[in-house]
Amino acid sequence: MDREVRFNVLLEVLMAWHLFRLGRWSFVHRRLVAGAWAILFVVLGAGAATLAGQTNDNFELSGIESTEAFDLIQERSPQAAPDGASARVVFEAPEGQSLSDPDNKKVVDRAIADLTTDGVLSVADPFTAGTISEDGRVGYASVSYSSTVVDLPQSDKDALEDAAQAAEDAGLTVAVGGDALAGETALPIAELIGIAVAFVVLALTFGSLVAAGMPLLTAVVGVGIGVVSITLLTGFVELSSVTPALGTMLGLAVGIDYALFIMSRYQHEVRQGRTLEEAAGRAVGTAGSAVVFAGLTVIIALAGLSVTGIGFLTQMGLGGAFTVAISVLIALTLLPALLGFAGRRVTTGRLSFLKDRDPEGGSERTNGRRWVETTSRFRWPALVAGIALAAIASIPVASMQLALPDDASKPAGSDARVAYDLIADNFGAGANGPLIVVVDTQGADEPAAAVDAATTRLQEMAAQDGSDIAAVVPALTSDAPEAQEAFAQQLEALQLATITVVPGSGPSDQSTKELVADIRDAMADLPGETGARALVSGQTAVGVDIANELTDAFPVYLVVVVGMAVFLLIAVFRSIWVPVKAALGFLLSVGVSLGATVAVFQWGWLSSLLGLDTTSPVIFILPILLTGILFGLAMDYEVFLVTRMREAYVHGTPARQAVIDGFAHSARVVVAAAVIMMGVFAGFALTDDVILKTIGFALAVGVLADAFLVRMMIVPAFMAIVGDRIWWMPRWLERFVPNLDIEGERLASRLEADGATTA
């Protein structure tokens, strides 16, 4: 026997055999296993409670022009704290009054004084800064802090809230925007919705409340350990608030699903007459193998986000991957331990209104068997119809626009949204997201002339017909000699000047993005003419730059992640065409998901069902993040569904009949898993946080499309068309690819040879 063949046989035996031993050991030593997980949770929880820091929603990326502009300000004028927290306090006088009325002005002046705390760098008084509306009713004060959002002391937040409340009590309408009061993302409702849906589906699947509770319990423990670990990490690393939320979302979804597959196999083994101990071992050795490789595909897809080199995406990916890894370990160890505690109650005490049937019973005339028989019989129409439906649903993707989330997408009536709307209505939409043009005069022979040249170009752009520039605020706004002298001294010291450009459109509008490009084009030859350079920054510019970086990183990410996952699936299924078909089907799922997201969030179709009252571009991180997460989840369903088909095929069943038998065995459990995952994601789609809402909705639709349209319609139709060729693999490749025995065939043979007992 060749060395490669001997290695493959050894690996396939060790994989399933060790998982079998792990499951049986956890069942027998259940108190030790449960105690170890409980201690780990308590220790991590205590650490998180004492050492945790705060999260933030600032998407930052080094190496892009907009970030370089902020870094330049920070380097030469650190007291300006460009990365510090900020707030906009908007005041509105009652109908028929103005803010300049004596009583109202006193209220505003008092609020400005109250806002000036030790941690505040500056407060721009609306009366002196010119931020009073034409009718005099609305004005806003811009507050800049020396601390970042993460480090902002609670005392500064309290002072901001108290000042706003005092002005409100005095008769003004007051709203606070900006990031200074950005709070933590609240998730309890989202989690409860997912858990409620999961419990109902599990109860219907297993017919037992005890059995239904076990996957929920293990998933909650896995999520708890994953999230407290991430929370503990915030004490040492600055993380986005989406990172723990994403960990919660994925941990609940995959944690319940992985436990569901092992529980289903456990009940099946018990019905075959196994002892409870051996049934637990066999369930982990067989279904557990599928869970391991399904989990690996998700982990690869999420951890692979680090190849983009984009910090916040790397954080989200690694945080999600860690939680998924914990969920896999929990399913392989804590679940069999809990099965040991529950004993026969898992398979008895059924709900009276449900039939007593095997969750994996494939011989019955179930709806799943009827469906796959129909799909296989009419395979060409099913394949064409499935692909056509996915293609039609993907049409909106062609008009997808990406942008950073802003306060315009906050819930109606929230403080941040009220402040945004008041500013947009009274000062123009662009006032909510001005562009900052930073002029670096370090290489200029005449710095003042260079700044003037940059200002002149911007003013000429503003004067053109159809210009999207509402206003240009020069670095020097006064003609007074003393002001000019002070500016010259400052320019000589800092070698830096800032020009503010107020767009005529909002921060997330396409015209504002085009304006960023136009300004950069207009400034392209400034270095050659003056020796100075101009860098464009601001919220829209940051979004444009990050979107460009994501676009460049996306192909690399796809090649690395899809390549690794396809190789893993080749080893799992001993086939070239199954992984290729799985990857192509995944592209259809992504298209449907992104198409639906554009239709709802950008076009406004059925948006009221999600609590949206306005349309907005899709959040810029969604395409690559959705691709990573959904790819992993899609491969999950591919593994769980096609594993049973291959199991039937390797046992001698003809290829087309193997598709039917394998589908009938696994369809009920896969449907339950998909519905649970959709319920979890849909719960997050109902939150107020627009980032989580968008991700939750996109994932819910993606799972719906992948599980029901792709895996249960297109896949069986395609496999029925291809027949035996679907399992083809070149002989030379077989020598190098390990046979992982995910079906547990060699495990069963070894157990029978060892004389394993049955009840």
Question: In which residue ranges do the predicted regions lie?
Answer:
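A short glycine/threonine-centered beta-strand motif
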Residues: 91-93
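Structured non-transmembrane domains adjacent to transmembrane bundles in polytopic membrane proteins
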Residues: 63-85, 95-177, 399-607, 617, ...
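Short coil/turn segments at secondary-structure boundaries
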Residues: 39, 86-87, 385-388, 435-438
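Membrane-embedded transmembrane helical bundles of large multi-pass transporters/channels
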Residues: 1-53, 121, 136, 144-402, ...
